[in-house]
């Protein structure tokens, strides 16, 4: 049974749309404790720590009956947008979101999503989660943005959507109409590479 160690609604929807059975349990890992400067590696390390934090504390959680015995796969993900070598997380306010979009207009950047799948068996009686395998990879997609007028950027920023998304945009939301094209995995830009998950979940 798959556990999504994330509160992300985008990742949840991707799994639901593909009819992948899973439970969503948010990881309580403190992301500020990681100091990795390489953006590619940072996304991977954060994904691992999210999944690992849940695996280490799983015995303290009130799990559904289906998860109390047998094989478990814990999926941790983290997305970071890279623009000209700089990491763009969620904008802290509308002003920052507007400035970013001014820079990104007509340009391209990379959406890196770190993926970690911790595979093991959990026995609720002994409260032991025995890890058998850990699979990790960062998947990167190139995102091209349309040339936008200031009023278009302001209109988008005023929806508040950019404030809740890595990089300040949501491909599956209002921001999708401002994205010219994607090179690489499409679903990766929404926070989870479904081809990567299929390959490693159903081996």
UniProtKB/Swiss-Prot annotation:
Keyword Transferase assigned to the entry: answer is: no
**Which cofactors, if any, are listed as required?**
a divalent metal cation
Gene3D superfamilies per UniProt: 3.90.950.10
Q: Where are the transmembrane segments?
A: none
Q: Which GO terms describe its biological process?
A: nucleotide metabolic process
Which InterPro entries does the record associate with it? ITPase-like_fam, Maf-like
Cellular location(s): Cytoplasm
Q: Which reaction does it catalyse?
A: a ribonucleoside 5'-triphosphate + H2O = a ribonucleoside 5'-phosphate + diphosphate + H(+); a 2'-deoxyribonucleoside 5'-triphosphate + H2O = a 2'-deoxyribonucleoside 5'-phosphate + diphosphate + H(+)
Q: Which residues form a coiled coil?
A: none
Q: Which residues form the active site?
A: 78
> What GO molecular-function term can you cite, just one?
nucleoside triphosphate diphosphatase activity
Swiss-Prot/TrEMBL keywords: Cytoplasm, Hydrolase, Nucleotide metabolism
The EC number(s) given in the record are 3.6.1.9
CDD domains in alphabetical order: Maf
Which GO cellular component terms are attached? cytoplasm
Q: Which SUPFAM superfamilies match?
A: ITPase-like (SSF52972)
Which protein family is named in the record? Belongs to the Maf family.
* Functional note: Nucleoside triphosphate pyrophosphatase. May have a dual role in cell division arrest and in preventing the incorporation of modified nucleotides into cellular nucleic acids.
Instruction: Provide the protein name.
Output: Nucleoside triphosphate pyrophosphatase
**Organism, as annotated:** Prochlorococcus marinus (strain MIT 9301)
